Amino acid sequence: MGRRKIEIKAIKDDRNRSVTFLKRKGGLFKKAHELSVLCSVDVAVFIFGTNKKLYEYSSGDMRELITRYTYHGGATEHKGPSDFNGGDDDDEEEGDGTPPLDQPMDAHMMPPHFQGQGPFPPHVMRHYTPSASPPIPNGVPFPPHGHGVPRGHTPQPQMLSRPGSRNDARRMGQPMGPQGSPQVNGFGFGQQQSMYGPPNTTMPPHMPPQMAPGPPFPYPQHPQHPPHPPHPPHPPHPQQPHQPQMQQQFIEDGRRATMPANFAPHPPPPHGPMGMQRHSVSPPQQHPHHVPQLPPQQPQQHPHSSPPQPQHHQMQSPPQPMVKFESPQQIEPPQHQHQQQPEPQEPRPEQQQQQQQSQQSQQPQEPQSEPARSLPPPPPPLEVKTELAPPAQPGRIPQPSLLDTAVKKLPRQKQHSIFTPIDENRSILSQNLAAFHAEPSKNKSSPPAHHRSSSVDESTSNASEASRGKDKDIASSPPLLKRADPRASISSVSSAPESAPAPPSRSNSLRAGPPRPRLKVQIPDEQSEDGSGSATAESASSAQGGASTDATSQSTRQNDSHSSTNMVLPPPSPSASALLSAGATGPPNPFAPKRPPQHPAPGLNIDTPVSALPSRFLNNEFLPSPSSFYPDWNFRGGDNNTLPSPLNFATPVVGTGPSFLRDENPGASLKRKSPDNLSIHGPISDNPLEAGNEPKRVKVDS
């Protein structure tokens, strides 16, 4: 009753193919497990499905098995598709034991098996290159670099994920393999050997030799990375002309060429020196590990390098050493360059944050904040925001706030509140942080606050109003941001040290050009009622007048912002008197919102609907209102007789039960044909009707 043997050929039906794949994959893994347990051997199985998914089984650590494979001298037995083309089921393992001749078979089979091995080494190479090669160098060569270790690990999953489709490409490229392989054998391995010994000792010096093999593939990359071209001279040996050919192959069929290159080491392994070449292959893998470093690094700065990265992954086979050599070239100069450059790029946001924080702390120290200012601009977003800042630069102190606020308004202002010794300003500024965030948007959306200031200024100076209107029209949004920011900066500077008020006045004098009207516009907002003399005092930039006007302007600006943002904040203590005098405009706005919640709280308690207040709701109106709506329910719910009553009704319901036994009473009760039923059954029918209706109601209610 032997099983029916099927013809071994590609299955065209997708459904049948998927089912066969699942069943045979499971059987293969099961067989591998049984083999590993029964014979105490290590087994690793890789399957790259047509869906580009990787399936694997390993009796132990997959990476260890792959590393062992890479360092192994050569396969004592190798099987290829041609060995099983007889059409017999693979289940018959009898024939498998005989071919220890495969070593000579390897020698003989290799020329044909560049195609045959195309799939074989791809499987093997797929296996070890994606996962094994990165782990090996990560453990050994990368420690000197240190950078590559995590990066080497990161590309591994990519290597694993990508190989599936690329394996197919490699299979397609198998004919290309023999061409690439001899080149790799002649050149790649010789250099790889040199690479092999030294890389473990000193990776950076070996980078140039790696660079030498690298140039074939890096040439396309060298235009991207000029530093690499100097390294190509290291390999200028005849290898380079062959390597350009390899480059073409890599470009056209990098995956394919690399696969044959890998294959080349496999055919020689039976020979002793070729085994050594494999060992040499493994070190390039170490260097390939450097390659993984490049892919993360390069993508940071050079998107162009990212396409070669897929090539690296495509190269997953030992040719990766080729790519890896190339990459090491890029790695040494570019790694340092990329690492140095991308590191500043990556840390820049962090450094910028730190710098901004330091600037916030340094804002009292104007020169320090300025260099930091120069640092944040390099990122484009910061540059845009710094562009807003330059007009405020004449005011040295406000600049940090502008830059910081442009980047991060909250932390600096918070720090302002922290550094400022003002008692109440701390809390106010901390509260204003949210207000300031809302303010720039609200100010941008609504310049009426500025119009208020202009209207107030009308009493002070009409010419200044015209200039202010022009300024508003020219750039209302940036000055708004700056205005909101200078408030915090001025408040922190002027209030923090008493000697500081002079610098704010200086900043006002410096801002005398276009920004002066802006500052004046904001300041008279508070002091408009106090008198136009305050604005003139600021224009005069007297130290005392400047200090008082700055403090008041801060408070009023904050008040205006609060009025716009509906934020309730107390005025700063130092300017409390001025605020009280000007209280008609600014201060009452913040106090008004506070007081309404305080006073209306009782008012709301009185005016609030009964539903809002449970006590009153229950005591006064709740019970009577339902009584008015549902008198029956009130009697039932309030009397507490409803509980027993439903029980009592339940018994009559039982009585109605017999009526349901097709007595006419229940039919009458259900259909409510009272006139007929009443005439027939008299008052008894009435009772069951009422009883039946009531208990039903009770049930629905309950």
UniProtKB/Swiss-Prot annotation:
Q: Give the species this sequence originates from.
A: Pyricularia oryzae (strain 70-15 / ATCC MYA-4617 / FGSC 8958)
Ranges for the region named Disordered are 73-608, 658-702
What ranges does the record list as Basic and acidic residues composition bias? 693-702
GO cellular component assignments: nucleus
Induction, per UniProt: Expressed in conidia but not in aerial hyphae or conidiophores.
Q: Which gene encodes it?
A: MIG1
In a knockout, what does one observe? Leads to reduced aerial hyphal growth and conidiation. Does not affect appressorium formation but impairs infectious growth.
Q: What CDD domains does the annotation carry?
A: MADS_MEF2_like (cd00265)
Compositional bias (Polar residues): 180-195, 456-465, 554-567
Residue span, MADS-box domain = 1-61
Where would you find this protein in the cell?
Nucleus
Keywords, alphabetical: DNA-binding, Nucleus, Transcription, Transcription regulation, Virulence
Protein name (Swiss-Prot/TrEMBL): MADS-box MEF2 type transcription factor MIG1
Residue ranges annotated as compositionally biased, kind Acidic residues, are 86-96
Among PANTHER family, the record links this protein to: SERUM RESPONSE FACTOR HOMOLOG
What job does this protein perform? Answer: Transcription factor acting downstream of the MPS1 MAP kinase (MAPK) cascade during conidiation and plant infection. Required for overcoming plant defense responses and the differentiation of secondary infectious hyphae in live plant cells.
On whether Nucleus is a keyword of this UniProt record, the answer is yes
Q: Which family does it belong to?
A: Belongs to the MEF2 family.
Q: Enumerate the Gene Ontology biological process terms.
A: positive regulation of transcription by RNA polymerase II
Top-level taxon in the UniProt lineage = Eukaryota
UniProt-listed Pfam families: SRF-TF
